[in-house]
UniProtKB/Swiss-Prot annotation:
InterPro entries: Cbl-indep_Met_Synth_N, Cobalamin-indep_Met_synthase, Met_Synth_C/arc, UROD/MetE-like_sf
The EC number(s) this enzyme carries: 2.1.1.14
A Pfam family recorded for this sequence: Meth_synt_2
Protein name: 5-methyltetrahydropteroyltriglutamate--homocysteine methyltransferase
Record-listed L-methionine binding positions: I420, G421, S422, E473, D588
Function field: Catalyzes the transfer of a methyl group from 5-methyltetrahydrofolate to homocysteine resulting in methionine formation.
Transmembrane stretches, start-end: none
Family, similarity comment: Belongs to the vitamin-B12 independent methionine synthase family.
Species name: Staphylococcus haemolyticus (strain JCSC1435)
Amino acid sequence: MTTITTSNLGFPRLGRKREWKKAIESYWAKKIDKAELDQKISDLHRENLLLQKHYNLDSVPVGDFSLYDHILDTSLLFNIIPERFQGREVNDDLLFDIARGNKEHVASALIKWFNTNYHYIVPEWDNVEPKVNHNVLLDRFNYAKSLNVNAHPVIVGPITFVKLSKGGHQSFEEKVQTLLPLYKEVLQALVDAGAEYIQVDEPVLVTDESEAYEAITREAYDYFDKAGLADKLVIQTYFERANVKFLSSLPVGGLGLDFVHDNGYNLKQIESGDFDSSKTLYAGIIDGRNVWAADIEAKKKLIETLQGHAKHIVIQPSSSLLHVPVSLDDETLEQSIEEGLSFATEKLDELDALRRLFNQNDSAKYDKLKARYERFQSQSFKNLEYDFDSVPTSRKSPFPERKKAQDARLHLPDLPTTTIGSFPQTQEVRKYRADWKNKRISDEAYNNFLESEIARWIKIQEDIGLDVLVHGEFERNDMVEFFGEKLQGFLVTKFGWVQSYGSRAVKPPVIYGDVKWTEPLTVKETVYAQSLTDKPVKGMLTGPVTILNWSFERVDVPRKVVQDQIALAIDEEVLALEEAGIKVIQVDEPALREGLPLRSEYHEQYLADAVNSFKLATSSVQDETQIHTHMCYSQFGQIIHAIHELDADVISIETSRSHGDLIKDFEDINYDLGIGLGVYDIHSPRIPTEDEIATAIDRSLQQIDRSLFWVNPDCGLKTRKEDEVKDALTVLVNTVRKKRASNNQNKPA
């Protein structure tokens, strides 16, 4: 009979209560020294390893843990260091500077990890000298062994690593070939240290481009085979279906497949005989990306099916558990809903229940989880009726007519300036919000504080000279969680944190029921801010696509239905702001690109649904109300036409780390709506120079009509320090003023 063992692909770095984030940020703020940081991080790594061992995993991953990002770790391992940072000792401080930038150099680009809300640091190949630096992966493997944890190393594979890179004169194949001897050196050291197998992550092999990479993929793994490493390697895929027949033909010991997000195709290939049954099948059967409890009976049946096609099966999550919170243990949720949830440790418990059932005929834990799932499923969360057809999905007039009405109302100057929405969330801001949520201060005291911060920042913006202002979003912990707290159908957890990028953690709400707007969400603060200035203040909302993509979505209702329910709720808030006299309303969609399916066959429907939902949320307003949107952290080339179809009066896009790449996208489309391409990187503490901002503006104006162009930072300023914000915005405004003066001088008399 086929043996069943358990494994994991990766575990959350943050810690139950964000201990990882707090330690790293304390080091950045010089509140602790490097020795104390190392101790705190070592303690957390130890806790993670032992916690996974506690759930009886047969093999625990090492190499998934990182001080910032595992792709950046791989870059440093192989000396793929940006030219501007070369010549320094390869250590954690270098890692942080590459990721965040410093006063002398800009940070490396930050891009979404496939279709998730995690972000990786893009490796740069310009003028690099690849070699193996200190093998941190070996250190972590040996550390796990010292704790008596049976571990397997995890490393991103050469095909995926090169695909996620940029720069350099070499071809794709040449870069892979350059890395192969370095991978061999690292892998051999791990095998020599006793690694039973090594998880080689190759998620790029589930994308449309995977067929184009088959030749170089075979060359790479043939190389490892000739080095005697083949039996120790497991090619791990996730997030979509893979070409099982091709991957099974490679000389490796095992193949990891996603049986949750593959739309059923991986199972069909297995049943068709495409899997080489002499290899180990690493079956991703527990959802690594969502927080709902597994249908444990369905998983049992899936394993029984797979047993007919593989001699050895390892059951595991469908992807790294990096994308879900650590544990439900510290939550105080309504039991009827909590029974339907499963965070990282609960997912490991589900694996343990299945392992016990199959290997030991022990059904106690399985029966308990099955009963719990059935109790949750017996409830009904579909209670509301919606009339989607009653809300318009197009504006009353085309953009040229709307622009005339808006220009007449707003009286904005040439190259209008604005920010994206948020201002620094200082320790004081966070303390007041926490004290209010925990009922340590009154509503009146909290509202008085919010009004004082709003007033202070309205004055700061006026003094700097910005043209369209914002209230600062001091009442919001997160741009999605805030709406999750106020819309019906959402659940907000207490400790449900996940890593977004670097030390930035978000707490995605859980959508469990029908979504409904019940009262104004943002009107009070926005109207107060507008009362303090004659300049327009933007209403700040998050769009339906982003709210859905940055939440843990329900799975009992089609995705499009949930998205449109959210759109109707946002439409209600847009109208409430307009009725209150707000002239400019921004509906952010930073996650529109991130949700794009990895397979192009699904793109058209996804984008059509996304555009429809955005227009459902924004089309009820009058022509003179200016609708803005914002997008960030993404590669936009694939969706540039959909961006245009949103028909937003103004879109601001995060581009500072890859400005040239985005400008190229506009060469293929005559973009005839308002647009601001972010002119400096807010993720870095570095203050931009006037020359840098002027260059960014000039480059943009080569492709974009000046009358349509806005000047703004590339993202919200929530994570920056107050002085950094003031200094950077002052440089921005001063640069624009000089551009205006120069343009006026060049106009014919």
